Amino acid sequence: MKKILDYIKDTKFKITIFENKIDIANYKEIIIFEENKIVINCNTFNISIKGNNLIINKVYDNEVLVEGNITNIEFR
């Protein structure tokens, strides 16, 4: 049971990359949202996602799912 509680309370940044999807957990804010570029702040750095037809499919308090033809991911 402790492991489940640790997961629920976890505040570390996590990114999971799928084909044409990126799931980002424990982000701070969405800075730029355009069809070809999305920038997300994760406290100490930003993630820049570039591609075509980018959309934010799901947004939760601490998680966001980006979909589209992703061509580049940068950590700054």
Named regions from a protein language model:
Residues 2-76:
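N-terminal intrinsically disordered, cationic/polar leader segments
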